[in-house]
Amino acid sequence: MADERKDEGKAPHWTSASLTEAAAHPHSPEMKDQGGAGEGLSRNANGFPYREEEEGAFGEHRSQGTYSDTKENGINGELTSADRETAEEVSARIVQVVTAEAVAVLKGEQEKEAQHKDQPAALPLAAEETANLPPSPPPSPASEQTATVEEDLLTASKMEFPEQEKFPSSFAEPLDKGEMEFKMPSKPGEDFEHAALVPDTSKTPQDKKDLQGMEGEKLPPVPFAQTFGTNLEDRKQSTEPSIVMPSIGLSAEPPAPKEPKDWFIEMPTESKKDEWGLAAPISPGPLTPMREKDVLEDIPRWEGKQFDSPMPSPFHGGSFTLPLDTMKNERVSEGPRPFAPVFFQSDDKVSLQDPSALATSKESSKDEEPLKDKADKVADVSISEVTTLLGNVHSPVVEGYVGENISGEVKVTTDQEKKETSAPSVQEPTLTETEPQTKLDEKSTVSIEEAVAKKEESFKLRDDKTGVIQTSTEQSFSKEDQKGQEHTIDELKQDSFPISLEQAVTDAAMTSKTLGKVTSEPEAVSERREIQGLFEEKTADKNKLEGAGSATIAEVEMPFYEDKSGMSKYFETSALKEDMTRSTELGSDYYELSDSRGSAQESLDTISPKNQHDEKELQAKASQPSPPAQEAGYSTLAQSYTPDHPSELPEEPSSPQERMFTIDPKVYGEKRDLHSKNKDDLTLSRSLGLGGRSAIEQRSMSINLPMSCLDSIALGFNFGRGHDLSPLASDILTNTSGSMDEGDDYLPPTTPAVEKMPCFPIESKEEEDKAEQAKVTGGQTIQVETSSESPFPAKEYYKNGTVMAPDLPEMLDLAGTRSRLASVSADAEVARRKSVPSEAMLAESSTSLPPVADESPVTVKPDSQLEDMGYCVFNKYTVPLPSPVQDSENLSGESGSFYEGTDDKVRRDLATDLSLIEVKLAAAGRVKDEFTAEKEASPPTSADKSRLSREFDHDRKANDKLDTVLEKSEEHIDSKEHAKESEEMGGKVELFGLGITYDQASTKELITTKDTSPEKTEKGLSSVPEVAEVEPTTKADQGLDFAATKAEPSQLDIKVSDFGQMASGMNVDAGKAIELKFEVAQELTLSSEAPQEADSFMGVESGHIKEGGKVNETEVKEKVTKPDLVHQEAVDKEESYESSGEHESLTMESLKPDEGKKETSPETSLIQDEVALKLSVEIPCPPPVSEADLSTDEKGEVQMEFIQLPKEESTETPDIPAIPSDVTQPQPEAIVSEPAEVPSEEEEIEAGGEYDKLLFRSDTLQISDLLVSESREEFVETCPGELKGVVESVVTIEDDFITVVQTTTDEGESGSHSVRFAAPAQPEEERRPRPHDEELEIEMAAEAQAEPKDGSPDAPATPEKEEVAFSEYKTETYDDYKDETTIDDSIMDADSLWVDTQDDDRSILTEQLETIPKEERAEKDARRPSLEKHRKEKPFKTGRGRISTPERKVAKKEPSTVSRDEVRRKKAVYKKAELAKKSEVQAHSPSRKLILKPAIKYTRPTHLSCVKRKTTAASGDLAQAPGAFKQAKDKVTDGISKSPEKRSSLPRPSSILPPRRGVSGDREENSFSLNSSISSARRTTRSEPIRRAGKSGTSTPTTPGSTAITPGTPPSYSSRTPGTPGTPSYPRTPGTPKSGILVPSEKKVAIIRTPPKSPATPKQLRLINQPLPDLKNVKSKIGSTDNIKYQPKGGQVQIVTKKIDLSHVTSKCGSLKNIRHRPGGGRVKIESVKLDFKEKAQAKVGSLDNAHHVPGGGNVKIDSQKLNFREHAKARVDHGAEIITQSPSRSSVASPRRLSNVSSSGSINLLESPQLATLAEDVTAALAKQGL
């Protein structure tokens, strides 16, 4: 059960752990904030307490970290809270006890310890534990404590040793395995950290299931090897306390953990001395694994948490690696093993070596739980033993050093993680499996910082280790204990120790049970409260820690051990002070830690609580003030943390790595000291693959995950982002962050932390990260302060559901855009603060992120790795990688500095990041959508979505205002060169994207696209990659939340395990999370979704949401105000899904049901349209009806997304396989990926109105339009439900040549262009847009973009927008190629409204496809009316696309005031125009879409005009775009009422889609015509399907006119094209919202209301002035053009499929003769011939005579007789004859030299020879005779 638990819990937890580990550093701060002791350390890292804790915690912090980890592990997670409650009491009491006992123990018991250490005589390895103990020489109470701890540890070890002996039976195998494996990893001890990093992901899945606790601890360190090892060690300690806690339930087991400690100490003492990691694993491994498993088995709930504790204990012992490895090998081999090999290796090393030392401390701590009295002793003994252990470890400096490093750093991380684990524990109970991982990661985070401190202290110890090891260790322990451990241990003691010892046992068991129960029920709600309360407690705890400072030094030591159990018990390490009383209470309070994140994270955190926790922990650790759970409390923590280490902070920020250590400034400072002091630690770290101590410290401190993150990046996702959970997002973030974020507060790994830790902490962390980025630019000290502010920005980060978004962009921008981020930092922070409520959403999103990250560890990690390696990892967002060029152009004005400065890095990072973004956005979006669909579609969907719809209606109105505000704000931000928009949008967008992704895939994606895109464009897709990174986790979390996670087992193993873990954890959380999430998710999802989006989009609203105290209020407020945004986020997510492909349809379907519930919500209907559109794209429209199907698809897509994520690094091929439904899906994914950026680009353009933006927009949007057009065509074809003219485009990609077979079918109502990418295209999905046919892709993108942009308001529009975003990315990829062909696309992009219109068309198409679910359409009708109401209020006479555009614009307007004004101006025009009808159709979606689109639309014209040769047309478009925007808005508002009419007409644009494609070529020349046409067509199509879905039966007055508008899709090109009024017949004047929008300024003539003659006539689509480039003239590399009979009209593409008959192939070796294999299979005849060696073979020596061995075996009798071969050898050589003579029977037969019984090797074949009995004697006699 323990293993299962571990697997289940660990998978999510591990997934979280990956991200968490990546986010472990963010978690560390948060853990510090959250966990009393661990939090204290974190605080100390962030603030003075942390520093004190750090110093004290360097040696102590390991144990303390263990406690913190344990507490956070949820095993003793509550203990942390409870301990934290009585932190002061515990501090005083423990200080007394520990001081007295430490002195006594140091004096008397130190000798005991020395004796005991004789047991662990090799405990020079205790140096590792010394790492746990503050290895620093400060000889102070800590010194005494060290002796005491050692003594106690030895006592505990001895005590535990017998128990270990008890456990050996169960631990025996793990021990052997663990020892072997531990030795194995230990030997690669240098790689141990690396292994911890690399295997983290692998381990994570297995550990989640198998070693939730074990792995959790181990895995958490994996994020950064040391963190992982430390985490494992700390978790071990935690686990041991956990076991002790189970010991409460498993009284005997704590001794066993202690025993493992003894084993650890003794065996490590023996073996570990030389091979600490090697020998140590021997005894500890089994013990710890056994203990962990047994304890976990004993404690079901605590299992994962306990696994966290026990697992690290084996790690601590070093043998833990084996159990971890064994378990991980078992588990990791199962699913994560793919990642496991990398992560596991590093993790093993880190965990293996570190755990031995940490295990000793932690096991000592564990024992302390049951043995409170002894705990003091054990604490000292543990420390001393650890010191000894470290000393032993020092013997094998590399391994021992690694152990020390890992132990110290991991322990720091563990401490922080424990602290953080308090929060994750809160969620972990919900996700016992998932959460334990979070806890583990949190522990890991805590441990990492502790480990860093302890590592440095360990290093110091190592320096002093020989003679001074104990003294030095003790001194270090004392000094550092006094310094940092005062706080750390104070916290730990306050948090865990008192409760650990006294309550820990009771609370451990109780907490285990309580946590299990609370985990089940209160977890969701409680998590939120706990997160908030925990942060408050953390803040108070931090103060207490600071106040307890000195007293805590001695006390800390005790809590260090007691806390080990206590921390495991009570997650809130920090809470121990304040919430000593809370220890019991923390069962729920503990959940409170995860609660804010829990509500949001309950959805996602259930999936990857650890991720979120880790992310939050990362942020918490990096920015303690950041915990959004309690904005004020966490900020206070951050502030206190900042004050604590203001100098340290600047110190830390001095280098990104140092800034990483900002989390543990003290630890970092100590580490830096040790950095300088112990170069071998650096060497060890480097050996471990951590890149050296400073790198380790940087990574671990940056996020306490950056190591993990960087490692995962090196490994190349998410999740994940860290080493375990966040290798992907966190890792990318960490990698970027580690490189770019130069502060601890700046924790790109915070993204995992966001998802892992409570949303708030993560957000604040994210804010901190952002602030830190900005402050890295601005000031180091400010960064921490920014961290204080950060909680709100972090929430916005979480809003994106991907804290990673800002972090990643910031990371990406680190080199180039840091200044931009610095300028943006304030805005981003403001936005983040404003979006405190969105933090909950972000938490959910973050939660989803971890799974991705978990899966990402391989997927994202590879991406990160690849991008780190300089490989352009083409993920879904692969195309955006080229975007950096465009981004460079656009970013030149917006964030050009970033892209230009870090273009290569951005490209490389963006390649990964984009893939991550793509995957994460898609996954997060899918997960979010799944989550929303399943959860919100469930009661939450009904209630939440309905409420959201209502709120969305309100928000629609509010958004009109807020959009104005937000668009003004965005305009303001854009005015700030999008630097702040990039930062704010990056913060907002990232928060937004995260929250949105979590909220709804499309919303997240849309918002991410929208908000992040500006950042993307500015940051060169930095934001997008971040969003992707974070969002995949969100997706994963959501996917995990959903059975959907399990829906696609084909995902990566990690994906499966993540999803399995997450699903199990999330499903476990599903009941309560669905309920609580119904409450919280309704609240948080609504508040998070809306608030996050509102936060991102509504600077004003964000301001309100800004306050942590206002989180709920703001959430509600934003729920009301932000539903539009939330749904836009959903649209973004759905676009992200579109980008994801499968998830799009799933999201659409999921959203559809949601929309059904949100009938009144215009956003909902838009989402529904989007869902329909996505469905059309992803699911050709069969699944659109079934929400269950969607759920499954979503799940599949989520997993597929994860698969994509893992595969993403390779290419979009994973996505393509992930999108088997339709080849189109991959393109939508690709397209969606671009729209994610394009919308934001539009936003940037509109908001910024900058030429660069326009340029970038034009390029990107051109491509985006092409991609979107293509995608749109795909959509049309995919969902022929309402296809008037179905243009089926089968795109086959061969060697960059895209063969597009366009089959025009006039079967659908509206021209539906279905682009089906043949399987060949899938691998080149991303490239396809480039090669596809820039024209076709551009045209398609134009269609898709025009439609998505037009229909962007509609859900399909949003997907379209996401398609556009992806298209944009693709455009970037093949931007240059598309530049010419993209001129039209650019114009289309410029006609954001056009694109929106076509988005609406797409929505229409989707809706048409959704026509299958007529009910949904009816719902959409209902929704649309509500949307129309709101849209009417906000008249968007944008036509089908315009409606969405205006609304989107409204949201986007924040950046662009001109757009708003012009939109208003054009409102009247477009109100008149029947475009309003189309807008009406898009009305519901527009809020979201418009929010994103308006700026984009407005900007897009400018952008296009700038970039396009048709500057006149573009400028006309641009000039008109603002007016058109306003008109579109007006029309959208008007269109709301006219939505029915428009909807009917909207489907027509689908038919235009093929023409759009055909017009692609013309688009360059007549860009506007094409753009208008395509956009109109697309919008028309979208709006029409939307309208149809929304008002299936109602044909509004504009049936012809509306049709004209909608049909205008083909003429939409002409409408769009100023010079193409000739397409009027086809373009519907109203249906040319893009055209209309453009028309107001430049092509009002293009506003031809002539209904498209044949919506299904692709030929008319080609009537557009610019048909797609003549592909006939294109020469493909592979000659595929020969097969493409493609006419601009479309439908004439002939894709010839040649079947390859391999039957005629002849094998080189002729083996085919024997293989009766036919292609059909089944005819393979494998002949198995048994060999009779006796008959056929002749022995060289003649031994075969005696070998009666048949291959089958059975008759072989091997008699083993030991012969004196010394004599025999000589005899054989010299006296063989005599020997033969001596062998009676044998000698006669065998030649003198060839004894039949004696083989040539001298071994006697004692098979069946008669003389075998006497042979030995004979030989001996013969030899003896011969004088041998």
UniProtKB/Swiss-Prot annotation:
Signal peptide: none annotated. One of its GO terms (cellular component) is dendritic shaft. Residues 596-610, 778-790, 1613-1623 have a biased composition (Polar residues). Residues 1-86, 109-379, 397-490, 573-684, 765-794, 823-863, 930-986, 1005-1044, 1087-1165, 1206-1228, 1304-1373, 1405-1640, 1778-1802 are annotated as: Disordered. Residues 1-11, 109-119, 174-194, 205-218, 256-276, 290-306, 363-379, 412-421, 451-466, 477-490, 667-683, 944-986, 1103-1161, 1324-1333, 1359-1373, 1412-1430, 1445-1464, 1471-1481, 1527-1544 have a biased composition (Basic and acidic residues). Keywords: Calmodulin-binding, Cell projection, Cytoplasm, Cytoskeleton, Microtubule, Phosphoprotein, Repeat. Its main location: cytoplasm. Residues 702-745 are annotated as: Interaction with KNDC1. The modification Phosphoserine is found at residues 28, 136, 140, 143, 283, 333, 346, 476, 496, 520, 550, 596, 599, 603, 608, 626, 726, 730, 737, 739, 823, 883, 892, 938, 1050, 1139-1140, 1145, 1161, 1165, 1352, 1539, 1560, 1592, 1654, 1680, 1783, 1788, 1791, 1796, 1809. Residues 1452-1472 are annotated as: Calmodulin-binding. PANTHER family: MICROTUBULE-ASSOCIATED PROTEIN, MICROTUBULE-ASSOCIATED PROTEIN 2. The exact function of MAP2 is unknown but MAPs may stabilize the microtubules against depolymerization. They also seem to have a stiffening effect on microtubules. This is Microtubule-associated protein 2. It comes from Mus musculus. The gene is Map2.
